[in-house]
Amino acid sequence: KCVKKHMHKDTLFVLDIFVPNPLFLYRPETRFPVMEYIDSLTGELTKVEEISVYDSDSGINKITWFYNTPSQTDDKIYNFTMRMYFPDTMKRLLIDSGFTIQKMIGKHDFTDFQEDSELQIYICKK
């Protein structure tokens, strides 16, 4: 409703979110590497690992990131949650909110959405 208040009749509302990957959501609850980078303050190589626990009933993915350096294991630990929106749910939410989905694309190059698309991009009008 808030978005629609700021729209006029010709405004396009574009929503860009990733498609949840079932292989990522249903993997074992063990640490997996996420990324590595050189810390700009210490110059140390920092490795980030994560554990994720997905609750399919709520659609919430509970994620813990562990930051490790050569000098300290679990130097920092961050916990956060992410709500997963599969395409069928996102379409229903947009339509139930009064939007008309003009086009759904799967990449920023405007390629049509496919079953294997990593993104779900909705171009909507009110």
Where in this protein do the model-derived segments appear?
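A short glycine-rich, Lys/Arg-flanked "PGG" loop and its adjoining helix->strand segment in the class I
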Residues: 1-12
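A short hydrophobic/small-residue beta-strand
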Residues: 13-14, 101
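SAM-dependent methyltransferase
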Residues: 14-91
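C-terminal lobe and adjacent flexible extensions of AdoMet/dcAdoMet transferase-like proteins
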Residues: 81-126
